[in-house]
Amino acid sequence: NTKQVKAAAILNDAFAAAGAAGSNPGGDGVSLINTQHPLQTGGFLANRLATDADLNETSLEQSLIDIADFRDERGLRTAIQGMKLIVPRQLQFTANRLMESTLRTSTADNDINAIRNMGVIPQGYTVNHYLNDADAFFIKTDAPNGFKHFTRTPLKTVMEGDFDTGNIRYKARERYSFGFSDPRCVFG
């Protein structure tokens, strides 16, 4: 359970301002989800909506449009695409309606569900039960060198008997870390 909590902390702290409690700024000095990721040639990369919005058809479509407009360090468009929608347990029903409905949700029109029809989120959605913010949603992209998980020392367990008490002593040890290298790996 500890490993899942630490992995989810990357997204739970994704909006925390640098220097704030729980912040985990990237190499550019700003939080993972931010509108002010500096680019080497000037300007900024935004991997969040300009205005915070709840998960709905409009916010999801705008997020995908913004992902398609990601720029590299030279200011050129990349071919990065959204791959998977990540939601907390509180948004699982909304995510299911948005991703699986044949027709548009929350409308009387008989329009197709463009998100599903176009297959713009090919890996669908997943519910992460360790996310703390009930209305935050994330789109994992196919950006290379994004999220990181390093296992420095694999899990090792040791069990031995205590001669004096007859009790069995058991210990486990492992070293790992979670992080990110490229903020283009996620949009939130």
Language-model-derived ranges and their functions:
Residues 33-69, 79-84, 90-188:
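Sequence/fold signature of self-assembling virion shell proteins
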